[in-house]
């Protein structure tokens, strides 16, 4: 069973996150700070994600759990008052392609809609070459909304979910 829980300020959570960043396929898409380095220092993971856990006002990190075991990461952040961006990945090849990511995204969409009823739009912007992720996001209900170029010059696909009525 797939569930979500807030990422915790524990060595176990930071270590799990670091281990996923070392996985080559995942690292290709998500760890941009030291993408060309052979290692991802645990201290760097703790610094970057610790701030998000200890001061959850801008970015809200969660773990994706399969039967209570961490298998992935999902976070949301406010781009504007009514617009939320998402980042997500599953940590190892063994858990990809099984529908877990789509289920986690559906749960996160519901969580955001419950916790933040003013939100009108959710978006996610994977690299345009990350076909597996794009398939997952479409399966979860996200719809194509065009292409953008990220700050590193990479072509990304913009996918969105819009809420027609306020949640109230």
Descriptions of predicted regions:
Residues 1-42, 168:
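A short, well-structured alpha-helix characteristic of acyl/acetyltransferase catalytic modules
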Residues 37-95, 111, 115, 163-165:
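Acetyl-CoA-dependent GNAT
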Residues 92-98, 128-129:
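Active-site acidic-Proline motif in GNAT/NAT acetyltransferases
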Residues 95, 99-108:
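Conserved acetyl-CoA pyrophosphate-binding loop and the N-cap/start of the following alpha-helix
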Residues 102, 128-146:
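Conserved active-site alpha-helix within GNAT-family acetyltransferase domains
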Residues 107, 111, 135-136:
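Structural preference for long, well-ordered alpha-helical segments within the folded cores
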Residues 122-134, 150-155:
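Conserved beta-strand-loop-alpha-helix junction that forms the acyl-donor binding cleft
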Residues 155-168:
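Terminal substrate-recognition subdomain of acyl/acetyltransferases
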């Amino acid at each position: 069973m797939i569930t979500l829980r807030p990422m915790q300020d524990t060595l176990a959570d930071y270590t799990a996150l670091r281990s996923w960043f070392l996985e080559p396929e995942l690292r290709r898409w998500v760890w941009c700070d030291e993408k060309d380095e052979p290692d991802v220092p645990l201290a760097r993971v703790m610094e970057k994600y610790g701030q998000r856990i200890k001061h959850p006002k801008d970015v809200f990190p969660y773990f994706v759990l399969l039967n209570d075991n961490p298998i992935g990461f999902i976070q949301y952040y406010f781009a504007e008052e009514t617009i939320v961006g998402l980042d997500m990945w599953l940590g190892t090849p063994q858990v990809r392609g099984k529908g877990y990511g789509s289920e986690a995204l559906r749960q996160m969409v519901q969580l955001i809609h419950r916790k933040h009823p003013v939100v009108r739009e959710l978006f996610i912007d994977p690299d345009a070459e990350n076909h597996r992720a794009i398939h997952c996001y479409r399966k979860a209900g996200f719809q194509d909304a065009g292409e953008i170029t990220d700050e590193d010059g990479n072509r990304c696909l913009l996918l969105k979910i819009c809420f027609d009525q306020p949640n109230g």
